[in-house]
Amino acid sequence: MSTTRHAHLRALAKINLDLRVLGKRPDGFHELRTIFQTISLADTLEISFTPARKTTIELTDVLNIADNLVVRAARMVMDAMRATGRIEMRLTKRIPMGAGLGGGSSDAAAVLLALPVLAGRVLPLPKLSHIGEQLGSDVPFFLLGGAATGIGRGSELFPLPDVPAQSGVVVAPGIHVNTAQAYRDLSRRLSGSLTTELQQNKIFSFQSLTWDTGRLAEARNDFEAVVFEQHPKLAAIKRRLVRAGASAAMMSGSGSALYGLFRDRNAIFRAIELLGEDTTYRISLVSRKRYRALWRRAMSEHTRSNVWPLQSRYNP
């Protein structure tokens, strides 16, 4: 008789502590330098796997999006493992969609990390990252967690030391930002083509910064220059965060969510009051150690070691 294996997962959101667009590459994509950071805001994903002769995938979620990223992730990881089985998933969204917080990418990464464990197979991190990159440029980051530098399209990753614990808020004003248009508007402002010399100068400037929460005032998000022109309300929200005492306030990704980090917890309540009716979430930064501890706790029934990615106790 086949045994069904279950897991209840939290798929954490991310913010960008810094985001620079260096220019447009010959392949048509933009060269990025960014600092990713996981935060406590999360979706929940219940997933079960039952060995079977053929693969079937069922997803229950209120959004009812055709070809949801988690379904694509499940299909791709099953193909990579050359495994078959019945997969049932229930996704509960809390991370605002299309806000620059990586919710869909994190959900997909959760499937990539969990399914090999439940299916009793091994997929090394480079293979998972390759699958993740095909799903979306942010997905590989959620296979690492904590803080990391992202280069290229953002999917080439270099883990950074964990930044000190800090609390804050994420504001989701519900404004739709056309990411493709934001890139086009930003491209028109970039000086010339991305020559090797220009790229190296911009990379040196980026790398010369010290990435800790004490120096975040030096950070920036290049998208703000064009997105704030189209959506002045977002600029007003950032000003309110600064007025409330945020040590760092910035748009995440291409928007429209913004975040503020605070050294004074009382300032968080001031910020929430100033933000009025806009949807606001209290958050904390999640270190890589804590991120992986959350995963180990969620998958403890099915794992047998502390290596990363998690290894299944059902491996042959």
Swiss-Prot record:
Tell me the Gene Ontology biological-process terms attached to this UniProt entry. isopentenyl diphosphate biosynthetic process, methylerythritol 4-phosphate pathway; terpenoid biosynthetic process
| Annotated residues for binding of ATP | P96, M97, G98, A99, G100, L101, G102, G103, G104, S105, S106
What InterPro entries does this protein's entry cite? GHMP_kinase_C_dom (IPR013750), GHMP_kinase_C_sf (IPR036554), GHMP_kinase_N_dom (IPR006204), IspE (IPR004424), Ribosomal_Su5_D2-typ_SF (IPR020568), Ribsml_uS5_D2-typ_fold_subgr (IPR014721)
Query: Which reaction is this enzyme known to catalyze?
Result: 4-CDP-2-C-methyl-D-erythritol + ATP = 4-CDP-2-C-methyl-D-erythritol 2-phosphate + ADP + H(+)
Q: Which Gene3D superfamilies has this protein been placed in?
A: 3.30.230.10, GHMP kinase, C-terminal domain (3.30.70.890)
Q: Name one GO molecular function term.
A: ATP binding
Q: Where in the sequence is the active site?
A: K14, D138
Instruction: Name the pathway it acts in.
Output: Isoprenoid biosynthesis; isopentenyl diphosphate biosynthesis via DXP pathway; isopentenyl diphosphate from 1-deoxy-D-xylulose 5-phosphate: step 3/6
Kind of enzyme, top EC level?
transferase
- What UniProt keywords apply to this chain's record, in alphabetical order? ATP-binding, Isoprene biosynthesis, Kinase, Nucleotide-binding, Transferase
Q: Which residues form a coiled coil?
A: none
The Enzyme Commission number assigned here is 2.7.1.148
The keyword Transferase belongs to this UniProt entry's keyword annotation: yes
Q: Which PANTHER family match?
A: 4-DIPHOSPHOCYTIDYL-2-C-METHYL-D-ERYTHRITOL KINASE, CHLOROPLASTIC
UniProt record similarity statement = Belongs to the GHMP kinase family. IspE subfamily.
Q: What NCBIfam families would the database entry show?
A: ispE (TIGR00154)
Q: What does this protein do?
A: Catalyzes the phosphorylation of the position 2 hydroxy group of 4-diphosphocytidyl-2C-methyl-D-erythritol.
What is the protein name for this chain? Answer: 4-diphosphocytidyl-2-C-methyl-D-erythritol kinase
The record lists the organism as: Solibacter usitatus (strain Ellin6076)
Q: What is the lineage of its organism?
A: Bacteria, Pseudomonadati, Acidobacteriota, Terriglobia, Bryobacterales
Q: Which gene encodes it?
A: ispE
